[in-house]
Amino acid sequence: MASREMLIIISVLATTLIGLTVATDHTIGGPSGWTVGASLRTWAAGQTFAVGDNLVFSYPAAFHDVVEVTKPEFDSCQAVKPLITFANGNSLVPLTTPGKRYFICGMPGHCSQGMKLEVNVVPTATVAPTAPLPNTVPSLNAPSPSSVLPIQPLLPLNPVPVLSPSSSTPLPSSSLPLIPPLSPALSPATAAGTSLPLFPGSPGSSSSTTSTKTVGTFPSSTTGTTADLAGADSPPADSSSAAKTLVLGFGFMVAMMLHLF
């Protein structure tokens, strides 16, 4: 793409420069000028005269002039019917058409001494027209199809539910239920001669035997004797203390089960 754009720019510049080419001024005879004794034929052989150029004749007006004549008058050095005559000492002749043109000096004897010039004017060099570029040249700023990404539609975002303090559900507490405090007042019988039953999982349940409350002494079946119960004389246990103990044990059992599960 960059090379094609560069070629286009170069072609346009070349065409413009050719169109703006300045016409060449040919000073007749070179440094010697338009005078007797100058080798005008040799000088003209090394020049190229094209349409648009100019012929410049420099000479002393008191001694020379410039006369344009036809081919027969040029050959005979006789300006019978001159086409145009210049006598100002610095004559400028534009070359507007291709073909041959003939010039001599009209002073007597000067043409025969070599003051004659034949000029062959060639057409201006033409440049072949640049082939038109196809209309399919992409723009430099146009993005390529592969670089255009499809636009994905935005998905609606689900609103995040906001829980109000009134609708919040309390989380289950992992803490163990509080164990009711032990009753500070136990009956004398419980404090002195009774032991509380131990439940599974308690610190004291590691022993293989289960402690039981000693209520009294039963008569031995082997002796067959009848004896009074050992605790007959002891005062009866307080019913409220026993109820508290039962509730305490049941609560402890429930606490241990909740802890295990």
Curated annotation (Swiss-Prot):
Propeptide: 238-261
Phytocyanin domain boundaries: 24-123
Signal peptide annotation: 1-23
Matches recorded under InterPro entries: BlueCu_1_BS (IPR028871), Cupredoxin (IPR008972), Phytocyanin-like (IPR039391), Phytocyanin_dom (IPR003245)
Positions of GPI-anchor amidated alanine lipidation: 237
Keywords from the named record: Cell membrane, Copper, Disulfide bond, Glycoprotein, GPI-anchor, Lipoprotein, Membrane, Metal-binding, Signal
Binding site for Cu cation: 64, 105, 110, 115
The protein, known as: Uclacyanin 1
